[in-house]
Amino acid sequence: MWDRCSEAAPAGPPPLPPAPAPAATRALSWAPAGGSAPEIIGHLQENYYNLCVEKSQKINYFILHKLQEVDKEIEKGLEGLTLNIAGNSCLMPVERVTGEDFWILSRILKKNLYINGLDVRYNLISDVGAYYAARLLQKQHKLIYLNLMFNDIGPEGGELIAKALHKNTTLKYLRMTGNKIENKGGMFFAAMLQINSSLEKLDLGDCDLEESTVHLGHMLKENHCLVELHMCKHNIKNCGIKQLCDALYLNGSLRYLDVSCNKITRDGMVYLADVLKTNTTLEVLDLSFNRIENAGAKYLSETLASHNRSLKALSVVSNNIEGEGLVALSQSMKINPTLSNVYIWGNKFDEATCVAYSELMQMGRLKPDNTDVEAFVVDGHVYLAEVSNGLKKHYYWRPTYGAACRHSANAGFTLVPVGGHL
């Protein structure tokens, strides 16, 4: 096994494989051919290179290149930096980060005062890397943003990270999206959120959580710090949304709730419409890719017209809503002065729908940047076309050119700007 010096692991960490023999240097664009060491220009890059040599760990030149970029920023006197080692870059060769790579990385970041964000999305750190991510959360008191989405982390890794957050008081934004932590991991996150008092933004989307939704609902009754919660693809049905709604009666902090890509129907909208009559904190609600249909849209419309004056953005994209329900939503916007963003693409438009939303835009009640449709006329008939606006168009990817952070494409983060700069 490797010599881990003073960082002795407690009993029970995920086992590391035997140390590989030092690998030949790859001839990447930032690594000189022939295996010679690259020019060292800063402390992070130098520390990483030296530690890899000391521990006989293969050097990941993608990490080395990214550390070089951060070193340059530090030399300019900048602080509060995010180290971005995303494994889905299209602009350069990528050697994805493994759990063993993350071990070395965590050791050099543990006392760094300049970096407060770490983005390692779309890599392969697995439960081994999750163990070291948990250690980092325990020791690094500057980190406010950690993105671990799609990293093959399982229930054991989810448990380690959740337990590390029991005592962490600095992390504000955590993305666990796409890691299959399952119900076991979800239970530990639910328990953590009853204790943690600093986390403001959490994404547990596509983590294969089902029963845990009930426990997360109970957690919202106790937690008064969380501002944004993403629960996409949880297989939430009407009983699950009822549990969440019961918690929202008592929660006074949540401003952004994302329950897209679930199995919520019109019956679930009865509970949600009721809680929106009294809830005054929720500002963004994402119901995309459910099946609320006309009845569900009408329940929401009645509440928005008569009671709620706090919701600013609503997405009902692809919900099998027909003209009757869509027109009801448009009518509620004429009465409700607060609701500014509505997203409806993927439903069943008739001519009455097209005319209703065209009128909203013509009168200035619905701004072109605040919806995902635009009107056009052919032979005297009004139609709606899709435009690339939404609550989180660039949540899972960013364009490699052009404006990466258009407000109209990511309106949810503009309206509720928790960690929006990260």
Model-derived segments and their meaning:
Residues 1-422:
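Leucine-rich tandem repeat or coiled-coil scaffolds
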